[in-house]
């Protein structure tokens, strides 16, 4: 999903990706840092499509730098969801579920099936 965000941003002159956080650098046209603590560039927002294990350092970085966050990662447990809610009182957070086309297609089909099949 990060690749999709990067390619979409590259096609829009009003948007730029200034950095990424990943263990692997696939030769992106922007710096890739191995942790949030290594980031040395300024960003206007964070778009998170990572893994629940990255939540804590990402939120700490966002609060420390007063950066709004879009969170579109799935698999959070109840304590992590509560952490997101608590952090949203400090910085703007948009928290949604997986935004991939596949999962949204499945969700739409499930809604249609529920209407047709009923209870």
Please place each PLM-identified region on the residue numbering:
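NAD(P)-binding Rossmann-fold cofactor-contacting core
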Residues: 8-31
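Short amphipathic alpha-helix with an adjacent loop that forms part of the alpha/beta core around
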Residues: 33-42
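Alpha-helix C-terminal capping/helix-to-coil transition sites in glycosyltransferase folds
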Residues: 41-42, 46, 90
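N-terminal Rossmann-like NAD(P) cofactor-binding module of classical short-chain dehydrogenase/reductase
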Residues: 46-47, 71
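Rossmann-fold NAD(P)-binding glycine/threonine-rich loop
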Residues: 53-65, 72-114
């Amino acid at each position: 999903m990060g690749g999709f965000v990067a390619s979409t941003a590259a096609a829009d002159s009003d948007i730029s990706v200034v950095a990424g956080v990943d263990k692997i650098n696939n030769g992106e046209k922007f710096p890739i840092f191995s942790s949030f603590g290594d980031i040395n560039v300024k960003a206007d927002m964070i778009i998170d499509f990572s893994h629940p294990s990255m939540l804590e350092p990402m939120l700490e970085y966002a609060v420390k730098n007063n950066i709004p966050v879009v969170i579109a990662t799935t698999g959070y447990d109840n304590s992590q969801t509560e952490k997101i809610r608590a952090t949203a009182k400090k910085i703007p957070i948009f928290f949604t579920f997986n935004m991939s086309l596949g999962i949204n297609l499945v969700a739409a089909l499930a809604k249609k099936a529920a209407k047709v099949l009923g209870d």
